[in-house]
Curated annotation (Swiss-Prot):
Species the sequence originates in: Bacillus licheniformis (strain ATCC 14580 / DSM 13 / JCM 2505 / CCUG 7422 / NBRC 12200 / NCIMB 9375 / NCTC 10341 / NRRL NRS-1264 / Gibson 46)
Protein function: Catalyzes the dehydration of D-mannonate.
Family according to the record: Belongs to the mannonate dehydratase family.
Higher taxonomy: Bacteria, Bacillati, Bacillota, Bacilli, Bacillales
Cofactor: Fe(2+); Mn(2+)
UniProt keywords, alphabetically: Iron, Lyase, Manganese
Protein name, entry field: Mannonate dehydratase 2
GO molecular function: ferrous iron binding; manganese ion binding; mannonate dehydratase activity
NCBIfam families assigned to the protein according to its UniProt record, in alphabetical order: PRK03906.1, uxuA
Pathway in which the depicted protein is active: Carbohydrate metabolism; pentose and glucuronate interconversion
Catalytic activity line of the entry: D-mannonate = 2-dehydro-3-deoxy-D-gluconate + H2O
Membrane-spanning intervals of the chain: none
Gene: uxuA2
Length: 356
């Protein structure tokens, strides 16, 4: 397993110099953030990003994300041009040596929370999702803006988008995802670029918008849309783990044995009610997920791909992008790597004893 770290480019207060100093972190997960959604990424800009990262002794391990244009999700006639642009981006990424692309198929909004700075008992602040508060929000009023959201929409555009999604069912969205997968995965396969779809976060409908990448059954359906190791998953423990019916270690073993786990997000969450949760430190005792069992499942399948510590709390007076500070994520990376080292050495010890 390669430990990686999310970096939001030159505007990120967490610099590459800082990331390079985290023990065990060797890769960067990033993207190009100044290209409008739907346009092809120029090869030159990809190389510029890659070289900047490599100049700091790190590798560009994953692109997260290449956003999927809403016309594709809506199934509009214009989707074919946007899909061609997407395929061009994949070809340019492959030419630059990038081999994994993370993406999602969530309508309009990316990951969603009700508050970005919920005060925890220890004095740190964290992201929180309270279903009742989200139900009372009107996203058209701009009450909340999150790091993963496309904020380029004007009020009229956002309202129009919601109207277009008004009558979309989950099956409609599945049909549009299938169209996208069957067009894009062959191109990715040809370029040897592994695609990794991120689960919906949270994994249930919000603001009346359908969400479909939510559980084992739907992940299984996704991988069968086009059967290829290049049509894989970004297995996010936090996104899926807020549903108590999602057994994360079991999902890792099940899809890992099929060769479908292409990328992993590791974080803990604390379930505080029905469809409500708060982010916690990565430590098992601080949340609802057993991070040891999750890492053990990855060790059991001999996972050799990239993983990253996901959202962290804001601690020690740090300010910056909510969920993406340096300190708590760095603690998470070292904690996760420590478990990985222990499990790896134990596995070798058992193998040696069995061979005596």
């Amino acid at each position: 397993m390669q430990m990686t770290f999310r970096w939001y480019g030159d505007s990120d207060p967490v610099t590459l110099e800082y990331i390079r100093q985290i023990p065990g972190v060797t890769g960067i997960v990033s993207a190009i953030y100044d290209i409008p959604v739907g346009e092809a990424w120029p090869y030159e800009k990809i190389v510029e990003l890659k070289e900047k990262i490599e100049n700091h002794g790190l590798s560009l391990s994953v692109i997260e994300s290449v956003p999927v244009h809403e016309d594709i999700k809506l199934g509009l006639p214009t989707r074919d041009q946007y899909i061609e642009n997407y395929k061009t981006t994949i070809r340019n990424l492959a030419k630059a040596g990038v081999k994994i692309v993370c993406y999602n198929f969530m309508p309009v909004f990316d990951w969603t929370r009700s508050s970005l700075d919920y005060a925890l008992e220890d004095g740190s602040t964290a992201l929180i999702y309270e279903e009742e508060k989200v139900r009372q929000m009107n996203p058209l009023h701009g009450e909340l803006k999150l790091p993963g959201w496309d904020t380029s929409y004007e009020d009229g555009q956002l309202k129009n988008l919601f109207q277009q999604y008004q009558h979309m069912t989950e099956e409609d969205l599945w049909e549009n995802l299938s169209y996208f997968i069957k067009a894009v995965i062959p191109a990715a396969e040809n370029e040897q670029v592994k695609m990794a779809i991120h689960p919906d976060d949270p994994p249930w409908p919000i603001f009346g918008l359908p969400r479909i990448i939510t559980n084992k059954e739907n992940l299984e359906r996704l991988i069968h849309l086009y059967d290829s190791s290049f049509n894989g998953l970004c297995l996010c423990s936090g996104s899926l783990g807020v549903k108590s019916t999602n057994d994360i270690p079991e999902l890792i073993r099940y899809f890992g044995k099929k060769g479908k786990v292409n990328f992993v997000h590791l974080r803990n969450i604390k379930i505080i009610g029905e469809k409500s949760f708060q982010e916690s430190s990565h430590r098992s005792e601080d949340g609802s997920l057993d991070m040891y069992e999750i890492v053990r499942a990855l060790r059991d399948i001999d996972f050799a791909g990239p993983a990253r510590p996901d959202h962290g709390r804001m601690i020690w007076g740090e300010t910056g992008k909510p969920g993406y500070g340096l300190y708590d994520r760095a603690l998470g990376a070292v904690y996760l790597n420590g478990m990985w080292e222990t499990l790896t050495k134990e596995k070798k010890r058992i193998a040696l004893e069995c061979n005596k």
